[in-house]
Amino acid sequence: MENFKHLPEPFRIRVIEPVKRTTRAYREEAIIKSGMNPFLLDSEDVFIDLLTDSGTGAVTQSMQAAMMRGDEAYSGSRSYYALAESVKNIFGYQYTIPTHQGRGAEQIYIPVLIKKREQEKGLDRSKMVAFSNYFFDTTQGHSQINGCTVRNVYIKEAFDTGVRYDFKGNFDLEGLERGIEEVGPNNVPYIVATITSNSAGGQPVSLANLKVMYSIAKKYDIPVVMDSARFAENAYFIKQREAEYKDWTIEQITRETYKYADMLAMSAKKDAMVPMGGLLCMKDDSFFDVYTECRTLCVVQEGFPTYGGLEGGAMERLAVGLYDGMNLDWLAYRIAQVQYLVDGLEEIGVVCQQAGGHAAFVDAGKLLPHIPADQFPAQALACELYKVAGIRAVEIGSFLLGRDPKTGKQLPCPAELLRLTIPRATYTQTHMDFIIEAFKHVKENAANIKGLTFTYEPKVLRHFTAKLKEV
């Protein structure tokens, strides 16, 4: 099969979910009712749902079977120990706290690391800054509600949709060290390495870059947290693009990657393929004090530390999903599906970020140059795409980035992108062709698409629940 141009999906579809078709008039009414915010649409009114790949895909038969082994004991569940063993074997991390999803881990570890830095290094809360190659929205939100400013230090190629570069998710290493020196190392409670970099377009981070980042962190004794939602996709890109690792397995690359962090926080709803679940893990005894504090907070915020908001069956499913998500054939198919969509869009003149791991990112700023950033061109494009074809996508731009919590001013965004997120093992190549055709219709009417302004704006993570109207 090596000589075929396109290979079919490497799985058989056994269970299907019917979806309904709607009219243009129905969809126009629905998107207005939602406040021009696709997050607020009812899922039954969506024909193809590209909002997120978080918990929205299929699961494997081995994952589903594993649920039957679930031990629902409140404490000391054997399902917890099965999950902790998977974490040790895959990542090499000794201490595991399950959470209901990624933000459950964030709400625990962020205040603990801030407190630790304050007690041990004299951190000044009025001056503290955390760094990342690019913070995911909830990580940024949890940092900000704990009073911590966030700073993204990414390479110049990251958001340039006209440039092809193997590792657009990389840290700007000089910018990282310069920033640490500027704010003072003692005022940096943590560094977050996001793999892959979602906001940059699902772009990978190289192992070489992670190694240097970690050496900088160790120089200043700053803890590193690996934001691990798409750890397997990142490992696949390393295998494909970093020559030193071309003969390594995904498992070997993953184990090597996690040497260059002290903790991991994971939304397991992505590469671990579960509908619900997350992880917070510490590498070794040097972070046992953090583990102890996080366990205490887990009881209050998530549940007892041996279930963390998950039923026993869900922990068993996650223990298997961590392995299933690293299957090489599976990863090759998934990355190829995204590449197919990006290639098809660019063939019709729709500019995209280079294909990443989990989504096609359309450059809405270039498709809708008449709409200024403060009128959210990618959000306007999302609404038009829904009207035209019933496709739900998500804005990754100024609308998501939000305002500076200290000044209230809109934060400058490096690109206005529309993310077409592909759920795992859910849509076929025919769906990709339909999406491409939908963009032909959107492109024909692009000049008539209007910008948006707020009718309701939450102060934190506004993109989830805000309401807007056309200007």
UniProtKB/Swiss-Prot annotation:
Modification sites for N6-acetyllysine: 5, 115, 156, 450
GO terms for MF: tryptophanase activity
Assigned EC number: 4.1.99.1
Pfam families given in the database record: Beta_elim_lyase
Cofactor: pyridoxal 5'-phosphate
Alphabetic keyword roster: Acetylation, Lyase, Pyridoxal phosphate, Tryptophan catabolism
Reactions catalysed, as given in the entry: L-tryptophan + H2O = indole + pyruvate + NH4(+)
Gene3D superfamilies the UniProt entry points to: Aspartate Aminotransferase, domain 1, Type I PLP-dependent aspartate aminotransferase-like (Major domain)
N6-(pyridoxal phosphate)lysine: modified positions: 270
Pathway membership: Amino-acid degradation; L-tryptophan degradation via pyruvate pathway; indole and pyruvate from L-tryptophan: step 1/1
Subunit-level organization: Homotetramer.
The family this protein is said to belong to: Belongs to the beta-eliminating lyase family.
PANTHER family: BETA-ELIMINATING LYASE-LIKE PROTEIN-RELATED (PTHR32325), TRYPTOPHANASE (PTHR32325:SF4)
Record-given protein name: Tryptophanase
Organism this protein belongs to: Escherichia coli O6:H1 (strain CFT073 / ATCC 700928 / UPEC)
Annotated gene: tnaA
